[in-house]
């Protein structure tokens, strides 16, 4: 057996999250986080799929609704998705106007500030403002 070639994997393309309320979740990612809807489709098994991405990113989030898989359980080991934001304070104001508040932070780090917000279905989102003054 030969050595593993690390150049075989080129880049991360998407990650998938299963949800029970597709439209509420899509609304959060689009209206609160500002993601763009790339496409919608139905899988061969009947899953409803919506792909989203940040404006300056090629990586997509695949939101999936598939009732046959049973109830949604977000395990404690699934920690979060992280997004870079321009202005954390402005983001918090806009999110609050849409009914969402930060669940933790903002906190200063060596390279900026971070905060967290809870997405629908119990998924956690980390927000990172790089280069912010501590």
Regions found by a protein language model. Give the residues of each.
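N-terminal beta-strand motif that seeds the catalytic metal site of vicinal oxygen chelate
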Residues: 2-24, 78-81, 131-134
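Vicinal oxygen chelate
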Residues: 2-8, 40, 51, 92-134
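Core segments of cupin and vicinal oxygen chelate
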Residues: 9, 16-58
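Helix N-cap motif at beta-to-alpha junctions
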Residues: 21-22, 86-89
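Short amphipathic alpha-helices within nucleic acid-binding modules
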Residues: 28, 89-94
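Short, charged/polar surface micro-motifs in flexible loops or helix N-caps
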Residues: 56-59, 68-70, 88-90
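Short, charged/polar, Gly/Pro-enriched secondary-structure boundary elements
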Residues: 57-61, 122-125
């Amino acid at each position: 057996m030969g050595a593993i070639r690390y150049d075989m994997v080129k880049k991360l393309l998407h990650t998938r999250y299963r949800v029970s309320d597709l439209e509420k979740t899509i609304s959060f990612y689009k209206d609160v986080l500002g993601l763009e809807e790339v496409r919608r489709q139905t899988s061969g098994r009947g899953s409803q799929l919506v792909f989203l991405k940040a404006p300056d990113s090629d990586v997509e989030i695949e939101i999936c609704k598939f009732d046959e898989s049973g109830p949604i359980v977000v395990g404690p080991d699934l920690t979060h998705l992280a997004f870079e934001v321009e202005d954390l304070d402005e983001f918090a104001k806009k999110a609050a106007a849409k009914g969402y508040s930060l669940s933790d932070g903002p906190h200063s780090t060596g390279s900026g500030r971070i905060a967290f917000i809870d997405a629908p279905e119990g998924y956690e989102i980390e927000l990172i403002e790089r280069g912010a003054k501590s």
